[in-house]
């Protein structure tokens, strides 16, 4: 179990055989909370630093003064800063040209990734959880939104189709509320048609939706 979240189940290296290693490659060997998922993605985009997640930043007195403040704590460096930079570029490409197009926000650079997972504790073998995580601005990460839809009733279970638009709406309102200025979307030398051919057209779906 993880020390970060007591109900999270992870494989230790000394208990991971060939089967566990293979299944971990596509995310079917570990159970984690949505909070821990968000923390992991934050580490991917913020230079590789795994931060201790928290829910309350400040506790205020009745007069508005700060009674207690939570200081951000870096648990450890999990990937190199150069790797984090590469991942930000890849996540932005997903939103610009791949299965995350529905997460685009006019005037803001957004990066994201879809995730359509099998739900093993359901009586329906086709049950899925459609998710999408988005970060903005992806060139200077400030906000992350993770949307997970449990067994959505839709023609598709792809997170890029169902959850990405919700991420876009939440992030756009947050960016505007926080006063982050809109900017002209950057030009790219990459051919959109060529890039799109290398990326999933509609997220990660086990049933091909």
Role assignments for model-derived ranges:
Residues 181-206:
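Short, highly charged C-terminal tails/helix-capping segments
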Residues 13-74, 82, 91-179:
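Active-site beta-strand/loop architecture of penicillin-binding DD-peptidases
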Residues 2-3, 48:
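A residue-level structural signature of the nucleotidyltransferase/glycosyltransferase Rossmann-like core
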Residues 3-10:
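Short, small-residue-biased leader/transition segments that mark boundaries at the very start
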């Amino acid at each position: 179990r993880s020390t970060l979240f007591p109900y999270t189940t992870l494989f230790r290296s000394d208990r991971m055989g060939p089967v566990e290693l293979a299944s971990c490659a596509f995310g079917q060997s570990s159970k984690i909370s949505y909070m821990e998922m968000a923390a992991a993605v934050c580490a991917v985009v913020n230079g590789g630093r795994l931060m201790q997640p928290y829910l309350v930043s400040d506790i205020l007195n009745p007069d508005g003064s700060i009674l207690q403040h939570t200081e951000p704590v870096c648990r450890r460096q999990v990937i190199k800063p150069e790797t984090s930079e590469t991942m930000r570029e890849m996540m932005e490409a997903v939103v610009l040209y791949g299965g995350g197009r529905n997460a685009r926000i006019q005037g803001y650079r957004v990066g994201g990734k879809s995730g359509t997972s099998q739900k093993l504790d359901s009586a329906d073998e086709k049950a899925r959880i459609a998710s999408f995580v988005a970060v903005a601005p992806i060139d200077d990460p400030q906000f992350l939104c993770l949307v997970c839809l449990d067994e959505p009733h839709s023609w598709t279970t792809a997170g890029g189709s169902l959850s990405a638009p919700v991420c876009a709406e939440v992030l756009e309102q947050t960016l505007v509320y926080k006063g982050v200025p809109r900017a002209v979307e950057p030009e790219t030398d990459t051919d959109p048609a060529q890039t799109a051919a290398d990326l999933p057209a509609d997220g990660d779906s086990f049933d091909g939706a």
